[in-house]
Amino acid sequence: MKKKKKAIYLLFLMPFVYFATACFVMWLVKTSGIYPSGSDTMYHVYRGDFVYNAIKSGNWYPLYDASWYNGVELLRYWSPLPAYVMAFCQFIAGGSQFGAYLIFIGGVCFLGACVWSFIGRGFNRPYLGAFIGLLWFCMPNNLCAIFIEGNLARSLSMIFLPVFIYAVYKYLDNQKLRYIPLMVFTFLLTALCHLGYAGMVAIAVIIYGIVYIIQKGRKRAVLDVVISMLLGFMLLGIWMVASLKGGITSLDNSENMANFFQNLWTTINPFERLTRGFENFYFGFAALFVIVFGILFGYKKSRTGFVTGLIILLMTTKSAYVVLKHLPGSQYLWMLRFISIALSMILMSFLMWDRLKKPLVLMLCVLLAADTIPSLSLIVGEHNDVSVQERMSARQDSTLISNAQAVTKQRLALMDESILGATGSWLVSDYGNPVDATFGAGREAANTSTNIVNLNKAFAQGDFLYVFDRCLELGDDSVLVKKSLLEQYNNSLDDLEAASNTVGYKRVEQNNDYILYHIDTPDSWGVVSSYRALAIGSGAVTISMQFPAVETADSDNLNDYTYEELSGYKEVFLNGFTYDDKEEAEELVLRLSRAGVKVIIYADSIPQDKRTHSQNFLGVTCSTITFHNGYPDMDTRIGTIYPDMFPQGHTTWNTVYLDGLDTVWGTFYDNGFSLDFYGTVKNDNIIMTGLNLTYFYSLTDDESVGQLLSNMSGISSEELPDRKIVPLKVEYGKNEITITSNNDNVNTTLAYHDIFSSSSNITCRNNLMYVNKGKTVIKMNYPYLWQGALVSAAGVVLMVVWMIVKKKK
């Protein structure tokens, strides 16, 4: 009885201790001289400011933000709860964004600690629970999430994650129904913080469930846990259905996956932080010691969490990546992001281990606390007490962002490959004299994400005419370039200057690190464009980068286009195209060629015939061939070509040559045989080429190959589309945009969204919205409202029915 009273006293005392600790952490961060740190921090601060100002104007759920990415749905693709929490913090801070950040940090520290105190009480281990509460915020991986990654959404979920794991543990232990709503609700809150992270939590819990079944065999209880998570997702349907349409789901995350695996020793080495800083994820040597100790000496009830923690740790290694990358959905297995989930399970199992002697409990607690010490410097920083306003203003000046804001009339493109993290985009659009931007943070939410990727890729390749021309297409009257990128990619400042001048931009400012270009325009404007050629297929953008006068088509499928649409171009390129009906596609090409349109087909990516399983089109068959280190000499109609060697990493070159050309314009010799790779079929307006020359040219800029590619089409790499800047009047209302134009077929330079609807004709090309002459009123409506509401309603009904059935049983 006395022990129970002490536990209750502790339960009421610890929140005061945690509050004092949170206030101390806030003071340390404020005086650190480096806050707000973290690459993505200012993205979350920006979203909070966006919601805060929208609510002040009477809009409680703003659908659209015009400042980033040519217009973006800021609450659609990233979970909304962190934005509203940050907005609430900003309200408490009297409108200060920096104050909001400090309150957010303090809140995560305080609430994250409190939940562990209650969990300790639930396991009848109040003192250990109170200690873990103090420790949780300071766990190295949690500190890195806040102060290095700046992933405030995931940090917010650290409040709900332990409660969810606790509910899972308790339900599997005693199958009491009261833990089911707790599981559903806390999982729902975790998903509202970060949907992707909720998916990772679900995977980790399924791993835990498999281990639990092997140890104890209670399959039905584990199934109940899985159902609870599914219901959590369903209840979120009103937001989640819209979130899963486009945006994040349209991006390929397979390359990102590889970045979330590392060497095992790096993950557990406690001294790595002292020698290399915090560039790597840290699981914790102390946590590993607790795992091993728990597996060897613990009992079944607590051992499951320790085993699961070890499995997750092993799954973070590069060796595991070799296996995991072949699994379905593997692009979302960012295993190093699972560390905090594993730590939560380990600490929960530590709490459950009630038979462990007190001296050993104390030893493990000391070890866990000692392991956090090197990471505490992330909170303390330089402790120089330099004002955050001073630092931000100085950074704005040193990067020429303040100069760019002064001259920009419509939109700014910051070409720095996000070297400043989200801070750069925040400095452009939410600090000083804010202006709209083509770039931003949280690119997964941008409908113009492919445009942005293409700009960065073209800049790296030195295709500067494409860069400046497409910046004009995106409505950027100012372009700010990080100079070090030129050296990084072995590009020339002279070429950059020449390209900017050709498009119409002039250099207006530069310092040692940045150079600012600007073009004179009206205050608000659009673009009327005319392209001489169109490229269709997955490789279309490569052609456009090499020849900026070529427009990139929206669809790769040739059957999606009519003769009337394509006959207005002088040339049509097919590179990586697809079709549904081969005969119809061939007939379209023939009809275009007879009308005088030149059709250039890059044969390497001709679709495979469904019946013959061979690559053939218009009677020409592609035969595979492999070169090593370089091409052989090529005899062409412009003379003999001696291409450069293949670049490093591409020394084995798999490609095709052609059989069935009517007129041969290019051959090479292989093993004594003359093989065709370039010529015409049916008539001189249908040109085919093999050997994957376009890709080779994109890698090497080989002059002779470039001349050959130009000869095929007659287009020069110096040629630009015909563009005319025209004035527009753009007015924003509550979930409404009104555009007034004096011209037809005007690119508004605003990103097109599926939430747009209008009685006037609005169209989408290259992810941008086009309008015609007159006034166009565009309404914005919540996307997929009824579908999402039905999913949420179904979740509520299923949960109620399920609970009733289980209660009766």
Question: What are these language model-derived features?
Answer:
Residues 2-3, 537-539, 718-809:
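Active-site-proximal, structured, solvent-exposed surfaces of multi-pass membrane proteins
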Residues 187, 370-383, 404-477, 485, ...:
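Extracytoplasmic/lumenal acceptor-recognition loop(s) of multi-pass membrane glycoenzymes
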Residues 1-387, 399, 478-481, 492, ...:
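Membrane-embedded transmembrane-helix bundle of lipid-linked glycan/lipid transferases
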Residues 628-682, 697:
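Catalytic beta-strand/loop cores that center a nucleophilic Ser/Cys/Thr
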Residues 583-642:
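A glycine-rich, often tryptophan-bearing local segment used as a flexible ligand/cofactor-contacting loop or short
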Residues 145-146, 200-201, 243, 421-424, ...:
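Extracytoplasmic/secreted cell-surface and envelope-processing proteins
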Residues 472, 487-488, 493-499, 513-518, ...:
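Catalytic cores of secreted or luminal carbohydrate-active enzymes
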Residues 135, 413, 480, 570-576, ...:
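Structural motif
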